[in-house]
Regions:
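Bacterial N-terminal signal peptides that target proteins for export
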Residues: 1-9
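Bacterial N-terminal signal peptides
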Residues: 8-18
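Cyclophilin-like peptidyl-prolyl cis-trans isomerases
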Residues: 21-302
Length: 302
């Protein structure tokens, strides 16, 4: 099943880091931020350690990619990809549809876009419910929306102020398609996703300069922590001519022998270093155009 292209100029609010309330998130977008002092190295207290069951190591013909799955935003999709990785379904799968300035598509047992696994199709997880107990790190508020991070996934959310008006005190939130975000590919039927997925390339804009309009149309279930340069180097084509680049193997880190596991730490967006990084990025950008995709937080892999 083929991922539909959405080249309409829909607004895609992109997220890449997070911040605790009370920093730049307290100001309306465009208000700007004073430049903080130059960055010092993050301390151990600024890092978080992802759960090994949520980490995938994808060995490709172009290099290694490290991905963090997100069970809060898309639990069914994350578990499906984890399951298929453990079954070996993704080993040897080609990147059969790769569009520069957009995405790399893979995960089809037929390597054509027309195949799927033997498991049932997935129900869409285009949005999820965010409550006061959701670990959402706020980046900023703009036009009644809040942008931030849930784990490493960039997220856009309705304002939690609206939670006062809902029965369960929760609001809608959704993963937003910054560079490195992973989404479940599907056909026109929203419930047609199965095994295929795509990874966003760095400059994910349409030929006319607009956004691809993927938010709330495709299930976002994870993000690249390391290896974005590999994603950007995958051979392009629609379809990709042979020989295609491939995923040689896809492994869940929790299943790997301890001696061969990568040890991963990510700067926590709500840490002092993370909050300062947000302010630095906002100060260095055009305040009107600033998005959380403009902020890069360190990932340490050993």
């Amino acid at each position: 099943m083929k991922l539909r292209l959405a080249y309409a100029a829909a607004l895609v609010l992109a997220a890449a880091v997070s911040i605790a309330p009370g920093l730049s998130g307290a100001k309306p977008k465009g208000a700007g931020a004073p430049a903080p002092p130059p960055a010092t190295p993050p301390t151990d207290a600024d890092f978080r350690t992802p759960d090994p069951k949520d980490l995938l190591v994808i060995e490709t013909t172009k290099g290694k990619v490290l991905v963090e799955l997100n069970d809060i935003a898309a639990p069914m999709a994350a578990e499906r990809v984890r399951t298929l990785a453990r079954q070996g379904v993704y080993n040897g799968r080609g990147f059969f549809r790769v569009i520069d300035n957009f995405m790399d598509q893979t995960g089809d047992p037929l390597d054509t876009g027309m195949g799927q696994s033997s498991l049932p199709n997935l129900q869409p997880e285009f949005t999820f419910k965010r409550g006061s107990d959701t670990p959402f790190a706020l980046v900023f508020k703009s036009n009644g929306a809040e942008e931030g991070y849930v784990g490493s996934l960039p997220v856009v959310s309705q304002s939690m102020d609206l939670g006062l008006l809902t029965v369960d005190h929760r609001v809608d939130a959704w993963g937003t398609y910054c560079a490195g975000v992973l989404g479940i590919a599907r056909a026109d039927d929203p419930a047609s996703g199965n095994s295929q997925f795509f990874l966003m390339r760095t400059n994910a804009t349409s030929p006319d300069g607009g956004s691809h309009g993927l938010d709330k149309q495709y299930t976002a279930f994870g993000r690249v922590l390391a290896g974005q340069d590999v994603i950007d180097a995958i051979k392009t084509g629609e379809p990709v001519a042979q020989p295609q680049d491939k995923m040689l193997s896809v492994k869940v880190v929790a299943d790997m022998p301890e001696a061969s596991r990568p040890h991963v730490r990510v700067v926590d967006a709500s840490s002092p270093w993370g909050r300062a990084a947000i302010i630095r990025a906002e100060a260095a950008s055009n305040p009107v155009d600033f998005t959380v995709c403009d902020v890069k937080l360190p990932v340490e892999v050993k």
